[in-house]
From Swiss-Prot:
NCBIfam families membership: mutl (TIGR00585), PRK00095.1-1 (NF000948)
Region of interest (Disordered), residue spans: 363-397
SUPFAM superfamilies with a match to the protein in the record: ATPase domain of HSP90 chaperone/DNA topoisomerase II/histidine kinase, DNA mismatch repair protein MutL, Ribosomal protein S5 domain 2-like
Gene that encodes the chain: mutL
UniProt-recorded name of the protein: DNA mismatch repair protein MutL
Gene Ontology cellular component terms for the protein in this record: mismatch repair complex
Domain of life: Bacteria
Alphabetized UniProt keyword annotations: DNA damage, DNA repair
Assigned protein family: Belongs to the DNA mismatch repair MutL/HexB family.
Organism: Escherichia coli O139:H28 (strain E24377A / ETEC)
Lineage of producing organism: Bacteria, Pseudomonadati, Pseudomonadota, Gammaproteobacteria, Enterobacterales
Comp. bias (Low complexity): 364-391
Length: 615
């Protein structure tokens, strides 16, 4: 067979073998493109695990009409232009292969509009030569990509797709990782027309632990130790779980990011494992969410087809830096607070050297004793060091250069050009509000909040009651019923049986399913908030309440149930309060604007401050 140039579609399908492994790979590439475009909101719609439809819609800068055809061509990108750019990459994408590869194994449609254009344009590629057709369309500022029938023309690849549930779980995990990398972006994920995940953007200076708790769970949040460690141009931030309380479930939480890019790096994992090895068993793994910031010149991201790995120019330096950062926080957690007396304090001690890794350790100089590292709330430089010259750094690198690179992907300020509200925006407009930052827990069941410089107290049991009521109140569809493993059979009177039969349709909307006979009623299913309740007490009380009613409204019944549910928390922790408020703000946004009585009480500190100043 003679040497010949492959047709464009065949060449793209070969490239797709590396880029498009499964539907989750498509979602990752397209969402990263949205982030590179400066999007602050991304909506992801999935059907049948991504095999039928993947739709990514963002409010980024958009693509000009003249560049739409280029966007679907191979090796066409706006991220880099020269070899110098390739050596200092800060964007998530840079190869220009994703859209061309995806369009070769699916029916891809690209619709986009920039702020300068009066109308949007739509592009799609088809045929053996992948010719691009562009036509006008209706679309707000931003971009929408639709990927239909993935692998429709490559049956062998489609045959290797797993079940719908498995493929969607992979997509869900990718979105979790991206949501942990970009707290400033709102991300909504739906599957088969149903909203599955809603990650609201965290405002600058806001409490990132809310999204952390929503993704990693309350158990991780309760054991999380905040890290903020710096040396020269290396910065390590994030959270590591207390190794003394790490469980197998927590050990699955291992998220690492390098300059905002999600990674699976053995060097970083090894450094963290070494720092925790004295407190972990042989079969245990550490749990962490860590963000490493490094000069883009000192890391090569173009070493893996799917960009899952990186290569550090100074790998030993990075390893020891991470090791000392994690070890310092773990050691501070074990230290007791300093006594407030005049007794002489012990001399500062040196942090133990990393003897396992070869080479000189640049971070083991003596360090002064510092306060205990806080849980879940980042503190100013809990284990930081003064900026020092970067050992063995490449000559000629300037710190200002790194700042310029970091600023290239900053989201444009919203004041530069106001955008017209999109049709779907009003539904989430109320979610832009927040109760504020949780400062501490007072009297075991009240949260002390700070918002815009104002202090307030919030009753956690009342907030929990409103959340339960929102979870029980049916919307457009009835509340999902959870079948009971062992149905509950109760004896009822004729009056109670009559009331139950009249309220049957209302109870069905609330997710309560029952069957009655002559003198008994059998409860077969209840909604999720009732699963952990003592149903042998709650259900008879509910039946007694219904027997006294003449009108059976689902909303009134949901309100009664919410008021009579037993709280799962006798004493609230910070992590539980943060998780609760995140759920309340998502499901009950109206409570933020107009808090009902008994929920929120402002605290006036001015008299106390005035009294202190007058002393």
């Amino acid at each position: 067979m003679p040497i010949q140039v492959l047709p464009p579609q065949l060449a793209n399908q070969i490239a797709a073998g590396e880029v498009v492994e499964r539907p989750a790979s498509v979602v990752k590439e397209l969402v990263e493109n949205s982030l590179d475009a400066g999007a602050t909101r991304i909506d992801i719609d999935i059907e049948r695990g991504g095999a039928k439809l993947i739709r990514i819609r963002d409010n980024g800068c958009g693509i000009k009409k003249d560049e739409l055809a280029l966007a679907l061509a191979r090796h066409a990108t706006s991220k880099i232009a020269s070899l110098d750019d390739l050596e200092a990459i800060i964007s998530l994408g840079f190869r220009g292969e994703a859209l061309a590869s995806i369009s070769s194994v699916s029916r891809l449609t690209l619709t986009s509009r920039t702020a300068e254009q009066q109308e949007a344009w739509q592009a799609y590629a088809e045929g053996r030569d992948m010719n691009v057709t562009v036509k006008p369309a209706a679309h707000p500022v931003g971009t929408t990509l639709e990927v239909l029938d993935l692998f429709y023309n490559t049956p062998a690849r489609r045959k290797f797709l797993r079940t719908e549930k498995t493929e969607f779980n992979h997509i869900d995990e990718i979105i979790r990782r991206i949501a942990l990398a970009r707290f400033d972006v709102t991300i909504n994920l739906s599957h088969n027309g149903k909203i599955v995940r809603q990650y609201r953007a965290v405002p600058e200076g806001g409490q990132k632990e809310r999204r952390l708790g929503a993704i990693c769970g309350t158990a991780f949040l309760e054991q999380a130790l905040a890290i903020e460690w710096q040396h020269g141009d290396l910065t390590l931030r994030g959270w590591v779980a207390d190794p003394n309380h790490t469980t197998p479930a927590l050990a699955e939480i291992q998220y690492c990011y390098v300059n905002g890019r999600m990674m699976r790096d053995r060097l970083i994992n090894h450094a963290i494992r070494q720092a925790c090895e004295d407190k972990l068993g042989a079969d245990q793994q550490p749990a962490f969410v860590l963000y490493l910031e490094i000069d883009p010149h000192q890391v090569d991201v173009n070493v893996h087809p799917a960009k899952h790995e990186v290569r550090f120019h100074q790998s030993r330096l990075v390893h020891d830096f991470i090791y000392q950062g994690v070890l310092s926080v773990l050691q501070q957690q074990l230290e007791t607070p300093l006594p407030l007396d005049d007794e002489p304090q012990p001399a500062p001690r040196s942090i133990p050297e990393n003897r396992v890794a070869a080479g000189r350790n640049h971070f083991a100089e003596p360090a002064a004793r510092e306060p205990v590292a806080p849980r879940y709330t980042p503190a100013p430089a809990s284990g930081s060091r003064p900026a020092a010259p970067w050992p063995n750094a490449q000559p000629g690198y300037q710190k200002q250069q790194g700042e310029v690179y970091r600023q290239l992907l900053q989201t444009p300020a919203p004041m530069q050009k106001p955008k017209a509200p999109e049709p779907q925006e009003p539904a989430l407009a109320a979610n832009s509000q927040s109760f504020g930052r949780v400062l501490t827990i007072v009297h075991s069941d009240c949260a002390l909040l700070e918002r815009d410089g104002n202090i307030s107290l919030l009753s956690l049991p009342v907030a929990e009651r409103w959340l339960r009521q929102a979870q029980l109140t049916p919307g457009e569809a009835p509340v999902c019923a959870q079948p009971l493993l062992i149905p509950l059979r109760l004896k009822v009177s004729a009056e109670e049986k009559s009331a139950l039969e009249k309220a049957q349709s209302a109870l069905a909307e609330l997710g309560i399913d029952f069957q009655s006979d002559a003198q008994h009623v059998t409860i077969r299913a209840v909604p999720l908030p009732l699963r952990q309740q003592n149903l042998q007490i709650l259900i008879p009380e509910l039946i007694g309440y219904l027997a006294k009613q003449s009108v059976f409204e689902p909303g009134n019944i949901a309100q009664w149930i919410a008021r009579n549910l037993m709280s799962e928390h006798a004493q609230w922790s910070m992590a539980q309060a943060i998780t609760l408020l995140a759920d309340v703000e998502r499901l009950c946004p109206q409570l933020v604007k107009t808090p009902p009585g008994g929920l929120l009480q402002s605290v006036d500190l001015h008299p106390a401050i005035k009294a202190l100043k007058d002393e």
